């Protein structure tokens, strides 16, 4: 079996188990059984349940990055808005699993720490996909800030059953505008020129760019 196919099987097995039993059901033997893999193969892909969750995050990251960085002439906030909305699009099939996971999240510091590190890597990738630096002190602060933005937007996403995710867009847009006010401070912390990160194609959601522009005109 090809590695990519085995990895995808693990991702789908994690989703199914989370939907059924939340984190309580996420055990390596169950993941292997659901994925149709033996334990040694699973171990090479995801040696622990936390590693399997990190594998899921990388899978979602890949789906988002495939959409490209957006239009270079767009403001950074608009590029990041588009990238993050692509992330929530990719998470739509995971909504039931995420809801169940949120209800069954145990008070486990090691689990929380492992997932927090993985989330920071994902948010750094989202910034880079939007051609915003994630390196240096300013980059680290941007990553941490985007984690907070994502936490609020994800809560809205889990309660948002609209087809266009309008409630999610509203929260995300508002939080990004709040974060944007810190941009001058971050530039003073890290004044070096930004080296562009080229990922690929054009943005997927023109209507979402229009949403952001319309919100800006309403505020002004």
Model-inferred region functions:
Residues 30, 82, 86, 100, ...:
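Amphipathic alpha-helical interaction segments
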Residues 128, 159-220:
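C-terminal peripheral helix-coil segments that are non-catalytic and often amphipathic
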């Amino acid at each position: 079996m090809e590695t990519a196919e085995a990895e995808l099987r693990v991702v789908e097995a994690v989703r199914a188990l989370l939907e059924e039993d939340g984190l309580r059901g996420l055990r390596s033997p169950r993941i292997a059984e659901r994925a149709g893999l033996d334990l040694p193969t699973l171990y090479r892909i995801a040696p622990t349940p936390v590693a399997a969750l990190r594998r899921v995050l990388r899978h979602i990251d890949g789906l988002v990055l495939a959409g490209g960085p957006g239009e270079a002439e767009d403001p950074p906030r608009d590029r990041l808005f588009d990238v993050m909305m692509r992330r929530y699009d990719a998470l739509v099939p995971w909504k039931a699993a995420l809801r169940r996971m949120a209800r069954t999240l145990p008070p486990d510091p090691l689990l929380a720490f492992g997932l927090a590190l993985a989330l920071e890597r994902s948010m750094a990738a989202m910034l880079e996909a939007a051609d915003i630096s994630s390196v240096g002190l300013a980059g680290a602060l941007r990553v941490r800030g985007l984690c907070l933005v994502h936490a609020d937007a994800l809560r809205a996403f889990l309660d948002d059953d609209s087809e266009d995710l309008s409630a999610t867009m509203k929260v995300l847009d508002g939080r990004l505008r709040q974060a944007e006010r810190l941009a001058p401070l971050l530039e003073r912390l890290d004044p070096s020129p930004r080296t562009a990160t080229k990922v690929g194609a054009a943005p997927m959601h023109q209507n979402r760019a229009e949403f952001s522009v319309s919100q800006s005109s309403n505020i002004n």
